[in-house]
């Protein structure tokens, strides 16, 4: 207890001496005042030597002798408060000495040179003659042996001071080391945070610069577009103004001519001589009639001057601009992942479809080889192909919708031969009631005969599907065509010319004139044999080859 008090008193005395030393420092030489010490009128103190140096520096042109100013009088400023000090004829020697400060300096020097008192071993407060030599572990205070034997610590555990001293000293040293290490780590974290601040500032500066550049680019685009649209309005304005001004000039010239004509007519009305009047009246009347009939006023369209076609609606663009925001990398990565997954799924579906097509095509090739022979038409129904007329401009799309066909490797089969529905079995088909120009006879006959067959499972899949059904029916078609050709109505012959022109562009070939005349000759009488329309698709077969 007494040791701590002594230590506190010693530290307090040392602090007092340090504060006193600060008050005894000269503001010029920054050292302790040297006697004699003079006091200025502003109550600040200076060494006389320092005051003389300031005076000489302020008055450099005054004569000196032995380093001192000879002339009397002068002035200088206080170095502490800049107050002007006026000297009398004695100069700096006329300033009063501060004896109090000189005495304090002497006392301070004596105390500072006195040897330090050695602190003796502290004594026990209860037993003044006993030294503190043990440490109470329970109370955690140093004490003496008598306190352990008879005093307040007789029931406590004690230990020698040296053991406790070494232990606490090591603990204190370890604690200091931990604090030092912690301070180093904190300092490292502070350095990292400072670097992070610099990085943040640099990155933000770059992002701001990039953002400004992008917005400047947008500004440039808007300005460019604004200039282009303004120029378009200006061009239209000039064109319309030129047109209107042309009309103004035209009407002005006409008005001027009519005014002159009216003026001359009024003057001619005052002619007193009837003979002269009648001689010139016809010519004047003719001019008036021509002027009234020849001139036609051109009226401008309604809203010609409004320029409503240049109205701009920027609501959508304004909404888009207001929704401009920073892009998020996480959302972009998720979108990219979803797109990749969708692409992989589509690739897998395409691979499966390609495999199925390969398998189907392999089976179809075998069936095509077997059914290639019976697909030929009878020789009596085949007609030599004639070249298409070069002057027919009708496109391929002029083909009648009922003439859709199914293309296979060996031949071309009409779709109607593969598609059978419930309506065909219950009543007359649409091909029977339709115009024969759009539906050939063999197509109607085949639809009637094949209505009892089971419906095709793959015939409704659309044009271009290849299957064995088209090949199996090809042999039946040859006989059906021959039978259906004899059942054509007489109305077909009346529309033969238009049907031939409509179908000549897409591969339908009509019989030649020689064949028609032969058919008429063989039929004889008033009931000639109806013309036969044969479909030739040899040019499609050549494409497959």
Swiss-Prot record:
* Compositional bias per record (Polar residues), positions renumbered to this chain: 417-428, 486-506
For this record, the Gene Ontology CC terms, alphabetical, are: cytoplasm; nucleus
Q: Does the keyword Disulfide bond apply?
A: no
Q: What happens when the gene is disrupted?
A: TRIM55 deficiency does not affect B-cell development in the bone marrow and the transitional stages in the spleen. However, mutant mice display an impaired germinal center formation and antibody production. Moreover, TRIM55 deficiency suppresses the activation of B-cells in response to various stimuli such as anti-CD40 or BAFF. The double deletion TRIM63 and TRIM55 mice die in utero and peri-natally and exhibit a spontaneous cardiac hypertrophy from birth. Mechanistically, hearts have decreased E2F1 occupancy at promoter regions of multiple E2F1-regulated genes compared to WT.
Ranges annotated as RING-type zinc finger: 26-82
Which residues of the sequence carry a binding annotation for Zn(2+)?
124, 127, 147, 153
Q: Which keywords does the record carry? A: Coiled coil, Cytoplasm, Metal-binding, Muscle protein, Nucleus, Transferase, Zinc, Zinc-finger
Q: In which tissues is it expressed?
A: Widely expressed in various tissues, besides skeletal muscle and heart, such as brain, lung, liver, spleen and kidney.
Ranges where the record places region Disordered: 324-352, 359-378, 417-532
Q: Where is the composition biased (Low complexity)?
A: 474-485
- List where in the cell it is found: Nucleus; Cytoplasm
Bias regions of kind Acidic residues — which residues? Answer: 328-352
This entry's Enzyme Commission designation comes to 2.3.2.27
Q: Where are the zinc fingers (B box-type)?
A: 119-161
Q: Which GO terms describe its molecular function?
A: identical protein binding; protein-macromolecule adaptor activity; ubiquitin protein ligase activity; zinc ion binding
Reaction catalyzed = S-ubiquitinyl-[E2 ubiquitin-conjugating enzyme]-L-cysteine + [acceptor protein]-L-lysine = [E2 ubiquitin-conjugating enzyme]-L-cysteine + N(6)-ubiquitinyl-[acceptor protein]-L-lysine
- Which stretches make up the COS domain? 269-327
Instruction: Output the GO biological process annotations, alphabetical, semicolon-separated.
Output: diapedesis; leukocyte migration involved in inflammatory response; macrophage migration; positive regulation of non-canonical NF-kappaB signal transduction; protein K48-linked ubiquitination
Per UniProt, the enzyme's principal EC class comes to transferase
Q: What induces it?
A: Expression is inhibited by the LPS/TLR4 pathway.
| Modifications the protein undergoes after translation, according to the UniProt entry | Targeted for degradation through the proteasomal and lysosomal pathways in the presence of SUMO3.
One Pfam family for this entry, by name?
zf-B_box
Q: Which InterPro entries match?
A: COS_domain, E3_ligase_FN3/SPRY, Znf-RING_euk, Znf_B-box, Znf_RING, Znf_RING/FYVE/PHD, Znf_RING_CS
What does the record give as the function of this protein?
A: E3 ubiquitin ligase that plays an important role in regulating cardiac development and contractility, muscle growth, metabolism, and fiber-type differentiation. Acts as a critical factor that regulates cardiomyocyte size during development in concert with TRIM63 by regulating E2F1-mediated gene expression. Plays a role in apoptosis induction in cardiomyocytes by promoting ubiquitination of the DUSP1 phosphatase. Promotes non-canonical NF-kappa-B signaling and B-cell-mediated immune responses by mediating NFKB2 'Lys-48'-linked ubiquitination and processing.
Its protein name is Tripartite motif-containing 55
Its lineage reads: Eukaryota, Metazoa, Chordata, Craniata, Vertebrata
């Amino acid at each position: 207890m007494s040791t701590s008090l002594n230590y506190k008193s010693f530290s307090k005395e040392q602090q007092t001496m340090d504060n006193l030393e600060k008050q005894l420092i000269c503001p010029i030489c920054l050292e302790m005042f040297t006697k004699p010490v003079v006091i200025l009128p502003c109550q600040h103190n200076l060494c006389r030597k320092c005051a003389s140096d300031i005076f000489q520096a302020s008055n450099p042109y005054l004569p000196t002798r032995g380093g001192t100013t000879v002339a009397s009088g002068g002035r200088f400023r206080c170095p502490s408060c800049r107050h002007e000090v006026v000297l009398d004829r004695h100069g700096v020697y006329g300033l009063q000495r501060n004896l109090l400060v000189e005495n304090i300096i002497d006392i301070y020097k004596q105390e500072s040179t006195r040897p330090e008192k050695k602190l003796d071993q502290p004594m026990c407060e209860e037993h003044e003659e006993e030294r503190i030599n043990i440490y109470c572990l329970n109370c955690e205070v140093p004490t003496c042996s008598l306190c352990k034997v008879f005093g307040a610590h007789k029931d406590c555990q004690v230990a020698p001071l040296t053991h406790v001293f070494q232990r606490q000293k090591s603990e204190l040293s370890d604690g200091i080391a931990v604090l030092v290490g912690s301070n180093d780590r904190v300092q490292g974290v502070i350095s990292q945070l400072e670097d992070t601040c610099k990085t943040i500032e640099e990155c933000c500066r770059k992002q701001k610069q990039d953002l400004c550049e992008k917005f400047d680019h947008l500004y440039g685009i808007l300005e460019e577009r604004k200039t282009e649209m303004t120029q378009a309005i200006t061009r239209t304005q000039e064109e319309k103004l030129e047109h209107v001004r042309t009309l103004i000039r035209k009407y002005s010239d006409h008005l001027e001519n009519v005014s002159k004509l009216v003026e001359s007519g009024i003057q001619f009305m005052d002619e007193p001589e009837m003979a002269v009047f009648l001689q010139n009246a016809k010519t004047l009347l003719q001019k008036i009639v021509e002027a009234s009939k020849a001139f036609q006023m051109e009226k401008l369209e309604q809203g010609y001057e409004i320029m409503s076609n240049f109205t701009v609606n920027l609501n959508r663009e304004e909404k888009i601009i207001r929704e401009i925001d920073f892009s998020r990398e996480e959302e972009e990565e998720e979108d990219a992942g979803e797109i990749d997954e969708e692409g992989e799924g589509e690739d897998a579906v395409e691979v499966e479809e390609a495999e199925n097509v390969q398998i189907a095509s392999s089976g179809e090739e075998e069936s095509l080889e077997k059914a290639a022979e019976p697909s030929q038409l009878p020789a009596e129904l085949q007609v030599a192909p004639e070249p298409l007329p070069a002057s027919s401009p009708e496109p391929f799309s002029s083909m009648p919708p009922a003439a859709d066909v199914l293309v296979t490797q060996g031949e071309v089969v009409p779709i109607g031969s593969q598609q059978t529905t419930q309506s065909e079995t219950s009543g007359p088909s649409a091909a029977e009631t339709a115009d024969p120009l759009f539906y050939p006879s063999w197509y109607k006959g085949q639809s009637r005969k094949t209505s009892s067959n089971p419906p095709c499972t793959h015939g409704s899949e659309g044009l271009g599907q290849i299957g064995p059904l088209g090949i199996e029916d090809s042999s039946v078609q040859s006989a059906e065509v021959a039978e259906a050709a004899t059942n054509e109505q007489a109305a077909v012959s009346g529309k033969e010319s238009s049907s031939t022109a409509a179908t000549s562009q897409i591969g339908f070939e009509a019989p030649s004139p020689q064949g028609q005349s032969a058919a008429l000759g063989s039929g004889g009488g008033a009931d000639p044999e109806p013309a036969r329309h044969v479909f030739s698709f040899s040019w499609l077969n050549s494409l497959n080859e």
